[in-house]
């Protein structure tokens, strides 16, 4: 019975994860020596920093809505497993 309840949420969780990963900017393939972690950076002051523009296919409200849905589904899964 519990497995059936959990399986109901699985497709929705997978879809949300796929959409969320499409919102994350993809890193270009670079040699290991040239990755951003190996290159020291001087960060600007917060007042000088420019905010990156969100990708066209994913607005800020899109990720907020998905985060709310994932949080709700996680609560349901937690409640379903804690009841048994």
Curated annotation (Swiss-Prot):
GO cellular component: plasma membrane
Lipid positions (S-diacylglycerol cysteine): 23
Major localisation: membrane
Extra remark: Entirely encoded within the coding gene for rzpQ (AC P76158), on the same strand within another reading frame.
Protein name, entry field: Putative lipoprotein RzoQ
Keywords for this protein: Cell membrane, Lipoprotein, Membrane, Palmitate, Signal
Species annotation: Escherichia coli (strain K12)
Lipidation (N-palmitoyl cysteine): 23
Membrane protein topology class: Lipid-anchor
The keyword Membrane is annotated on this UniProt entry: yes
Subcellular location: Cell membrane
Signal sequence annotation: 1-22
PROSITE patterns listed in its UniProt record: PROKAR_LIPOPROTEIN (PS51257)
